[in-house]
């Protein structure tokens, strides 16, 4: 029992160093600074849950993307598309901002967000970005003071929306 405890402590000391090295490799893999956000989320997940299998993350996102893709029509306006995506995620699937326990670490670990359907602005925005990537929607993240939101990069006018507030569409003011 004591050996098992010592081994566990050694592993817990090694894992953060390995993850830091992997984050460094990820950052260097794209000199333009546009590195793979999904890989970064997986590394972050391993920091909080080192023994958890992360392959289910991509599978869960693929399934959600398949479901929402069937609901979006090609002739919809960008605003209608965003409304359909956010209605699917925040009303049909029940994702929401964790307003009660905002600082719960599980709000930052993506598998926990998918399981609990609760997150913080950046993880819920990442969810929209990941689904957008899978179904061909130009959704990117936007950092604001005190908040992280998502933007649909429309050719006519960008559409800003707040995943933490159930996808509420925002004005540019």
Task: Name these PLM-found stretches.
Residues 1-173:
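A structural boundary/capping signal
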């Amino acid at each position: 029992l004591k050996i098992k405890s010592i081994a566990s402590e050694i592993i817990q000391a090694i894992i953060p160093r390995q993850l830091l090295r992997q984050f460094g490799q990820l950052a260097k893999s794209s000199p333009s600074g546009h590195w793979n956000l999904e890989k970064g989320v997986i590394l972050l997940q391993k920091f909080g849950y080192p023994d958890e299998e992360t392959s289910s993350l991509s599978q869960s996102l693929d399934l959600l993307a398949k479901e929402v893709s069937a609901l979006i029509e090609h002739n919809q306006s960008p605003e209608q598309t965003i409304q359909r995506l956010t209605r699917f995620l925040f009303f049909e699937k029940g994702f929401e901002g964790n307003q009660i326990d905002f600082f719960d670490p599980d709000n930052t670990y993506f598998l926990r967000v998918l399981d609990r359907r609760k997150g913080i602005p950046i993880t819920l925005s990442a969810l929209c970005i990941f689904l957008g990537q899978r179904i061909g929607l130009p959704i990117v993240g936007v950092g604001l003071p005190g908040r992280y939101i998502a933007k649909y990069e429309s050719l006519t006018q960008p559409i800003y929306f707040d995943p933490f507030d159930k996808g509420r569409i925002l004005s540019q003011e």
